[in-house]
Regions:
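Long, distal/terminal scaffolding or interaction modules
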Residues: 1-291
């Protein structure tokens, strides 16, 4: 059996060979990457930083089709990485990342339907930079200790949330404890953020989409706050609208590039209604856009 670090080392070796030869950009495509291929992108981020420094301009564009890579995808990723997965991801994705771009999108199954597009536990744990897009769901503790990165969770609410049934996490897009101890960064949540959110959050901003037509209102968001979470819900501000234009604009462009025009149009429609649809979760007493 191949070692668990085989593919990440292979990608790193191939890219570094091209970088040393003078190429500023390399492209790598693969398919059916599975759970035994761990920490994909991590080796390359480290090798590039050691040899060219953290501010080097090299870029590796990695595209993985029909894939669900193993734990630690993009972990400690840097600005050298631009990675898109059609399929899904597992635990520890984008953990400790300092830059770069990652998109986890739905893949096409044997019936031609788009499925999955989700990621595992502790997504973007402690990330200080980078832009991360997830089309569907994330397991528990998404964006905890995040301190400067940007994230978009694109799963949308399309039916009644049924809070009266309890067990909120089972139907939520984020499965609990999201944004715990978050100190900076920007997050957009198009779906249900799940229970026990924002515990110990002291910085950054979360933009939450509302769906009053499905019973998901500001009160629904308050119901999901962790006990003693010191955050407040504010109307969307001017700078907040600019953030949404930037982050959701990038997400819409990524959906269109992956041949998902219908989903891109649905997200664009939410963005067009941003003042009515979105509110901001910010630490109590702190400006939402502090430097």
């Amino acid at each position: 059996r191949k070692p668990l670090n085989y593919l990440t080392k292979l990608v790193s070796d191939l890219a570094m060979e091209r970088f040393r030869a003078g190429s500023a950009m390399v492209r790598y495509s693969d398919e059916e990457v599975g759970s035994t291929d761990r920490a994909l992108g991590t080796y390359l981020a480290g090798a590039a930083a050691r040899e060219f420094g953290p501010d080097a301009g090299q870029r590796a564009v990695i595209r993985l089709a029909s894939s669900v890579p193993g734990n630690g995808l993009f972990a400690f990723g840097s600005r050298v990485l631009d990675l898109v997965v059609d399929g899904g991801a597992q635990d520890g994705t984008a953990k400790g990342a300092s830059g770069g771009a990652l998109a986890v999108l739905k893949g096409v199954n044997l019936d031609g339907l788009r499925v999955d597009g989700s990621t595992g536990k502790s997504f973007a744990y402690g990330a200080i930079g980078g832009r991360f897009l997830v089309q569907n769901c994330a397991d528990s503790r998404a964006c905890i200790r995040m301190s400067g990165a940007d994230a978009v969770f694109g799963g949308r609410i399309t039916g009644p949330v049924r809070d009266e049934e309890g067990n909120l996490a089972s139907r939520a897009h984020l499965k609990g404890f999201a944004f715990e101890y978050m100190t900076g960064g920007r997050v957009v949540v198009l779906g249900d953020p799940g229970p026990w959110i924002c515990a110990g959050m002291t910085g950054g901003v979360v933009y939450q989409c509302l769906y009053p037509e499905h019973g998901f209102t500001a009160e629904s968001v308050r119901r999901r706050l962790a006990r003693f979470a010191a955050v407040e819900l504010l109307p969307l501000s001017g700078p907040g609208r600019a953030d949404l234009d930037e982050l959701l604009g990038a997400y819409v462009a990524t959906l269109r590039a992956s041949n998902q025009p219908a989903e891109a149009a649905a997200v664009q429609a939410l963005l067009d209604q941003a003042p009515e649809r979105f509110l901001m979760l910010v630490p109590r007493g702190l400006p939402p856009h502090q430097e």
